[in-house]
């Protein structure tokens, strides 16, 4: 007979705590958890209350040593910012977990629950959970302080153009709106010959200068002025100024090129018409339809001026018009415009209809003009031309009249215009009485030139009924397909998430 015995079950033994005598499982310290916590506090040295700075103007928190960051409540960025405030004490323990404890948004308190571990007596690892209270203290950041002190800008971009017309500035304004280059500006100030853009950082101003160089022919100079300095920390506070000069040529200007420049452009005639100003100056020779593009560097190397200003435009009536079929081209001639037609016309001033004085000229508007049409142009015969290049030209090389564009009834065009443009919010120093007429000229240029229209956001005006693309006079109009709807977003699509802590 064999005796069956139950298998021996090995159970861990118990020992008595060396302090209180309570039976416990063996551990390296031979002390119960309660006694160990009473003797050792692993959170010692970690502050339980910390202050954190918050700017209520811009809703940003201060991150040492000198930056301000924007963080939403109970976000990971804000938690990282809070832990950095106690980074040195936390380096002595092992951080296991960290999370926010909910507080009222207006309580100016942030509570963070931390779980830490640390090796204590004889290799025993103790874990502890505690809460750090962050007191939010209001403090105005440096940027907001400068705003309140009216000394908030650090860089300014001064854009200037020495012309009597603002067509280039109106075009530049639309490009700035289209690409959102005005979003970082603190203030935009309009003066009589340009615009000033104020920025809170030099980097934003440099970005604006680069944008201007890509859109219009310019040159610029940079300077800076020392405002304050700290010799102990070796820090300096500068104000930077970027002076940007746009070429003094606008659309519909008649210019006279230097002989050297005209020869380098394909033996063009020196008298040319500016048909467009974008990133380069687009010129056309009204006698041969030869076109040329002049960039900023070429212009400043061989500068030229406008012979007449827009107020000198005179109205002519077309008496006779014929198309030139065979265009003679000299050796080395440049490109010929395919969008224009060369014509020979006889015109007479509308102010001299009681006389029989007529003028003969060649024009690039042969595809638009018919006998009886009204056209705007410059009378170079009876005009006092004070230009060094014109004075050196032979009289037979200077045309009597240079026609610029066909004339339409402006009142009717304004009444039928069913589109509009947006404008920059800016401070106006002086309002010129001629600004409205110049703005209407720019709107007419948009209707007549499709190439410029492509770079501009045009919005449909719902108050004006939609009509055909051309009116009874044949004046060009912008089609509905080229217009955008003017949208107004009145509510925040993201809802209330990430709202500011203080109001």
Curated annotation (Swiss-Prot):
Keywords: Acetylation, Cytoplasm, Nucleus, Phosphoprotein, Protein transport, Transport. A motif (Nuclear export signal) lies at residues 480-489. It comes from the Eukaryota. The modification Phosphothreonine is found at residues 433, 470. The modification Phosphoserine is found at residues 258, 468. Belongs to the NMD3 family. This is 60S ribosomal export protein NMD3.
